[in-house]
Structure formats: C-alpha cells, structure tokens
From Swiss-Prot:
Pathway: Carbohydrate degradation; pentose phosphate pathway; D-glyceraldehyde 3-phosphate and beta-D-fructose 6-phosphate from D-ribose 5-phosphate and D-xylulose 5-phosphate (non-oxidative stage): step 2/3. It is found in: Cytoplasm. Belongs to the transaldolase family. Type 3B subfamily. It comes from Chlorobium phaeovibrioides (strain DSM 265 / 1930). SUPFAM superfamilies: Aldolase. This is Probable transaldolase. GO terms for molecular function: aldehyde-lyase activity; transaldolase activity.
Length: 222
C-alpha cells in the first residue's frame, strides 16, 4: 500500500519524506487555507506556485483541487493545474458536473482524483468516468455513525470484480487503525495527516521496552 500525506504544509511534507515512506501528496482548499498567512493577498498565482513547490519535494502524485462547481470552469481550472507539473493530479468533486469534468480531463490524458466520495455508487461512476484515483472519506462517515471502512471494502470488492483501474485512496484518516484497516482491506493508498503519520510508529510497549533496555545498558561501561 502506498502512503500519501494529506497536507499543504511544506515542512510536514519534508518531514514525511525524510521517513522514506512518502509516495505522494493530497491537498484541498481547506488544507491550503491553513498555510496561508495573509488571505487578503493570496492569489491564484500564489496557489499555483505553492503546488509547484510541493511537486519539487515529492516524486509522486500531488493532488490539487479545483474550486469551481460547473463543468466548463472545472475543466479550464484543471487544465491550468495540470500544466504546473507532470505530477499534478486534478481533484474534482463527485458531482454530475465533476464527473463530466473528470471524463473530459481523463480523455485529454490528465490524471484525476474523484473526491468527496461517500457511497459505492459514486465510486462506480468515478471509475467509469475514467478517474485515476477515487477518494472515499472514511472519517467523515465515522463522524455520522456510519462505518467508513465498510465503504472502502465495498469499493475495493467492486473494483476487483470488474477490473476498474482507478486507485482507491482512503481519505479523511483520523487515526492509525484507519491505516491498518485500509491495508487489510487492500486499498491502494492511504492519505494520512502528519499527526497520524507520527502516531503510526508509537506503541506504549515500545516505549516501556526501550526505557528498560536503556536502564539495563548502564551496566556497559565506556
């Protein structure tokens, strides 16, 4: 399974890359907003420059999301995003207009990521429209007392049944168990916030065991 980081923060991307586990990056407008220091002066050029900076850090797909709602505007924006770097993947929302944009962009050879997917039927439509990636949001489903990982399992099974080529990105990851379940189910990718990446390596028995080892190591004299 591939690991993407779900952030627009360059420092977090660098830190994840240093672990040797980073295969790509996903961003969205909310993540971009978090890194903007002065919203009154953040232009589209600044946004494109920031995506380019991310692409320079990572040798893998970098998802950048359109901010339009109608098909024509999504296509225009998607083409501009794709021109930033060969690694850019254009994220489009799973709406009727978004599906039309995905179809158009995919036929033009532009990689696409169908985002805000919350049902198997949406995932089927994304695959049939030619999406390169499909992003089910597991945490947001868990938030409304629905089993987000069950959705991932359904999508993986359906895609396997019919040989759909879209890669499944488990998104809206809230804790390490989401990552483990994604791997168990057979999802292609988990896109993970840096806070969760940091927790993947942590276990209390590792900490207590290390403490005991260090205490016992005191018998070894210089």
């Amino acid at each position: 399974m591939k690991f993407f980081i779900d952030t627009a923060d360059l420092d977090e991307i660098r830190s994840a890359a240093e672990l040797g586990m980073l295969d790509g990056v996903t961003t969205n407008p909310s993540l971009i907003a978090k890194i903007v220091k002065d919203p009154s002066n953040f232009t589209r050029t600044d946004f494109f420059d920031h995506i380019a900076a991310i692409c320079d850090l990572v040798d893998g797909p970098v998802s950048a999301e359109v901010t339009s709602l109608d098909t024509a505007s999504m296509i225009k924006e998607g083409e501009a995003l794709a021109a930033i770097h060969d690694n850019v993947v254009v994220k489009c929302p799973l709406t009727i207009d978004g599906l039309k944009a995905i179809r158009h962009l995919s036929e033009a050879g532009i990689a696409t990521n169908a985002t805000l997917v919350f049902s198997p039927s949406q995932a089927i439509l994304a695959a049939k429209a030619g999406a390169s990636f499909v992003s089910p949001f597991v945490g947001r489903l868990d938030d409304i007392s629905t089993d987000g990982m069950a959705l991932v399992e359904d999508i993986v099974d359906i895609y396997d049944n019919y040989g759909y080529m879209a890669e499944v990105i488990v998104a809206s990851v809230r804790h390490p168990q989401h990552v483990v379940e994604a791997a168990r189910i057979g999802a292609d990718i988990a896109t993970i916030p840096f806070s969760v990446i940091s927790r993947l390596a942590v276990h209390p028995l590792t900490e207590s065991g290390l403490k005991k080892f260090m205490e016992d190591a005191s018998v070894i004299k210089p």
